[in-house]
Amino acid sequence: MLKDGSMLEISRPCGKDAAEILSYLKIIGGETHFLMMDSNGLGISEEKEAAILEDSLKEERGGMHIGRINGEIACMFSLVCSHRRKTAHTGEIALSVQEKFWHIGVGSAIMETLIKLAEDACVENIELGVYADNVRAIALYERYGFEAAGRHRRKFYADGIYYDQLIMDKYIEVDQNKLREIRKACPR
């Protein structure tokens, strides 16, 4: 349950969610400069998005997720795990929350879910990239144990301004026997 008493229903999106997700991405893209898109969204077709979503469902470790409040997409997040032996212990997270759902605990709920997904996937090193001027997001990540690991200078460009990207990561304990099995199944 969130701070306002509403429930966040988390699920894996599929192809039939494509149109709604593309609309969501246009909304959030117009709400802040902290995302990789603007109010034009991703600029891909509904069919292409549906294929991406269906491919994501095949992902056994991590994958894409949406969170709904009263049936409406409030957030989207993902954990992308490495499929290589040398980096099978790593995964990258990304998340977004629609502005009208800010300040009610959605970000915290997402972070708790992502950390649990990482544990289940035997991801020891969870990584993320964030605009260096996104102080609220950085504070959220720090509350969940993420630390600054590096910086990409002038990584993003929007409205005539360059922005740095802060790289953050968190290390967690995982089942080493399970991780060895995952590594064995990975291509070189």
Report the location of each language-model feature:
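A short beta-loop-alpha structural element at the N-terminal edge
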Residues: L8-S23
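Short glycine/proline-centered loop/turn elements that form peptide/ligand docking sites
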Residues: G107, M111, D133-A137, R154-D159
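Conserved GNAT acetyl-CoA-binding A-motif
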Residues: M111, A118-G129
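Conserved catalytic-core motifs of GNAT/GCN5-like acyltransferases
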Residues: E127-Y131, E142, E147-Y163
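Terminal substrate-recognition subdomain of acyl/acetyltransferases
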Residues: M1-D4, I161-R188
